[in-house]
Amino acid sequence: MSHISADDVRKVAKLARLNLPDDKIATYTGQLESILGYVSQLEQVDTTGVPETTRAVEVTNVTRQDGVDPTPVREEILNQAPQREGDFFRVPKILAD
């Protein structure tokens, strides 16, 4: 594992367009070293025979067969309306003239 310097932290912050105050440099230096140490451990894991993937759990779409369902008759639907005007539902007016 390589050592992370304060200049490395400043460079990463600049590349990420982060305004990093000088009093936080030491904190972030330690945190970046810790992260890279963990990545170094992961690099040593033998993954021979493990298929490549982009996620831990596979995502599948739940689908159903398309089918034609009978459509209710318009007159049956309109007859259930509290108020009706011809072939339309009558609803209270909500917009001013």
UniProtKB/Swiss-Prot annotation:
SUPFAM superfamilies, per the entry: Glu-tRNAGln amidotransferase C subunit (SSF141000)
One Gene Ontology MF term: ATP binding
Catalysed reactions listed for this entry: L-glutamyl-tRNA(Gln) + L-glutamine + ATP + H2O = L-glutaminyl-tRNA(Gln) + L-glutamate + ADP + phosphate + H(+); L-aspartyl-tRNA(Asn) + L-glutamine + ATP + H2O = L-asparaginyl-tRNA(Asn) + L-glutamate + ADP + phosphate + 2 H(+)
HAMAP family: GatC
Subunit structure of this chain's protein: Heterotrimer of A, B and C subunits.
Family recorded in the similarity comment: Belongs to the GatC family.
Name recorded for this polypeptide: Aspartyl/glutamyl-tRNA(Asn/Gln) amidotransferase subunit C
Organism of this sequence: Synechococcus sp. (strain CC9902)
